[in-house]
Regions:
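Positively charged, low-complexity intrinsically disordered leader regions
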Residues: 1-52, 56
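Phosphate-coordination loops involved in phosphoryl transfer and adenosine-cofactor binding
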Residues: 33-39, 173-175, 274
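Phosphate/diphosphate ligand-binding glycine-rich loop within oxidoreductases
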Residues: 34-40, 47-159, 284
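Glycine-rich phosphate/diphosphate-binding loop of Rossmann-like nucleotide-binding domains
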Residues: 44-66, 159-243
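Rossmann-like adenosine-cofactor binding region
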Residues: 220-299
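C-terminal helix-to-coil terminal segments
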Residues: 295-324
């Protein structure tokens, strides 16, 4: 693994999952792997779990993490080629990225979509320009369209739950449902896109996506999933329910509905096979998910968030070993 931008950078998902779980069991077993190595963590938008878990993962491997809040602490960057920089941008990524390449051994970057121009966001210009000019491995801490560390964490958590529960006598695959939820503002499709991409690539589940009409995601990521606008039908016999809001893709970045009927509660959960409930966090309580779900025995959101460390540690370990 040289870069980590999407599931396409992973040769074998299950092998990487086992590596992450081995770090969970023994966090410091490779504490010298990153000795005398630095990772630069660049944030172009806010972060809590991603920021902290990546720093902890790097330190567990002996690396020195350095966090730089680009928007607040540095110059405004220009990403367009041949730009005439007579506006608000001060430094071009062509000049900044090679410097990061001199300072660090790995560059981890978190960007965010504008939700104004779909073509611009889905071109992934920001992260592609860093890959092009930095000259060192790049890890996505979330991009305009994907959140691979979150989705890898989700697979780890699902695998962990499946290992710890009694196995059915049949070889029935678990049913995983990704359900849209209401929100007070339009959110990116990153987490939903990425989760769909990883579950489909993993290939070990019956995968259903449910959302209101007009909230279809990009088919590039959902191909292979069953898609329905009937949430109750989707939830029947589900083993895992992943709750997430996203804004519209076709009429880009819009909110068409905030119907509270789409918020998961205990009554809806009764339709499932006592499903585990997942969310990437942060979550708007009693908007996206009810208190009774989040505080109940079926919620595994804290387990998910805890596993962010081991996901990041497995990825950084792979990159360090590849480039040692």
């Amino acid at each position: 693994m040289n870069n980590f931008i999407s599931v396409k950078d992973v040769t074998n998902i299950d092998t990487l999952v086992q590596k992450a779980l081995s770090y969970k069991a023994a966090p410091f077993r490779d504490k010298n792997l990153g000795t005398n190595k630095r990772i630069g963590c660049l944030f172009l938008n806010p972060s809590m779990r991603t920021r902290l878990s990546t720093q902890i993962a790097a330190q567990n491997l002996g690396m020195e993490p350095i966090v730089f809040n680009v928007g607040n602490e540095g110059w405004m960057l220009e990403f367009e080629e041949e730009a005439i920089m007579s506006g608000s941008t001060v430094e071009h990524v062509k000049d900044a990225a090679p410097i990061f390449g001199k300072y660090f051994d790995i560059l981890a970057i978190r960007t965010f979509p504008s939700l104004k121009n779909r073509e611009d966001d889905y071109s992934e210009l920001f992260i592609k320009q860093f890959i092009k000019y930095a000259g060192i491995p790049v890890v996505s801490l979330e991009s305009a369209t994907l959140h691979p560390l979150q989705s890898f964490t989700d697979i780890i958590t699902i695998s962990e739950c499946l290992t710890n529960q009694p196995q059915p006598s049949t070889n029935k695959r678990p049913k995983i449902v990704l359900t849209w939820a209401p929100h007070v503002k339009p959110l990116p499709q990153c987490v939903a896109n990425s989760f769909a991409q990883w579950i489909n690539a993993w290939g070990k589940a019956e995968f259903v996506i449910t959302h209101p009409e007009d909230y279809e995601l990009d088919e590039e990521f959902t191909k292979g999933a069953t898609i329905t606008h009937n949430q109750e039908e989707a939830l029947k016999d589900a083993d895992f329910v992943y709750v997430k809001n996203w804004s519209t893709y076709n009429d880009y970045g819009k909110i068409y509905t905030n119907n509270p009927r789409w918020m998961l509660n205990n009554k809806r959960l009764e339709l499932t096979n006592n499903a585990k409930v997942m969310h990437c966090l942060p979550v708007r309580r009693n908007v996206e998910l009810s208190d009774e779900i989040l505080d109940g025995p079926n919620s595994i959101v804290t387990q998910q968030a805890g596993n962010r460390v081991w996901a990041a540690q497995a990825v950084l370990s792979e990159i360090l070993q590849r480039n040692s």
